[in-house]
Structures are given as structure tokens and as C-alpha cells.
């Protein structure tokens, strides 16, 4: 198991209430953005420009792509924009879970931003997908988030 993976104790998990809501970062490539659009949940995008700040006011699941990786190299895996967003305690306190994307070419650091954020925020890592994700990934994530928010179909 990679050193950045931490098992979150089930008793520590705070499940969100209300309407499923996601916050995400996507670079100008828009890979994560395209995935989010397919989910059809309410969402807010973390700005690419570090000078722009946003604040959310409801519980959410954070989607984060992974930058860097390979072997034990994890420095820079979480985009600076996501770190900037989470430096706001109010934003950080409303995060209830994490989903990350990455490239399987990076081996055991595939989508490592998810485990890093899960460990740091003490929230569950709900799912990981590769690059743009597949139709199956979209369906799985829709089910996971719907159930996580207690809105089972």
C-alpha cells in the first residue's frame, strides 16, 4: 500500500445531506470538466487562475485530477488551485469525500491526488478513474454520489 493511502475509519465518515453537489478542478484541457458534465449533478468549478477565489456553502464531494507521479514521486500531485481552494477553512470543512483521476501509466501513483486529499482531509476516497473516464465510470460515480448523499434511486 502506498504511504499516502490511509483507511478512513467508518465511524469518522460524515455523510453529506441535501442535493448531491460536487466541486472540481479541471485545467484548460477540460478532461475533468467533461466528466463532471456527464454526471448531471450541481457543480462548481475551482478557477484555473490562482487569483480567483470561490467559497462554497454546502457539503460536497471534491473531484481532483492528479498532476505528476510515478514511483514514490508525489510532489505536486494535487494542483495548486485545489490547495488554494482548501486553504479556506470553510471550504475544507464542507468536503465530505474525494474522487480523483489520473493516468495508469504512473503505476502505484495512479490518481494519487485522491489518497493524498483523503488522508489530509480525513474523508473517504470514493472512486478513481483514468483520464476522461468511461461510460461505466460515469454510471458508477453517479450511483456512488447519489447513495453517499442518501438519495438512493
UniProtKB/Swiss-Prot annotation:
| Organism superkingdom | Bacteria
Give the InterPro entries listed for this entry.
Answer: Flavoprotein-like_sf (IPR029039), RNR_Ib_NrdI_bac (IPR020852), RNR_NrdI (IPR004465)
**Span of the signal peptide:** none
A GO molecular-function annotation: FMN binding
Question: Which biological process, per GO, is one annotated for this protein?
Answer: protein modification process
Give the matching PANTHER family.
PROTEIN NRDI (PTHR37297:SF1)
Q: Please name the HAMAP family in this protein's record.
A: NrdI
Its function, per the record, reads:
Probably involved in ribonucleotide reductase function.
Matching NCBIfam families: nrdI (TIGR00333)
So what family is this one in? Belongs to the NrdI family.
The protein here is known as: Protein NrdI
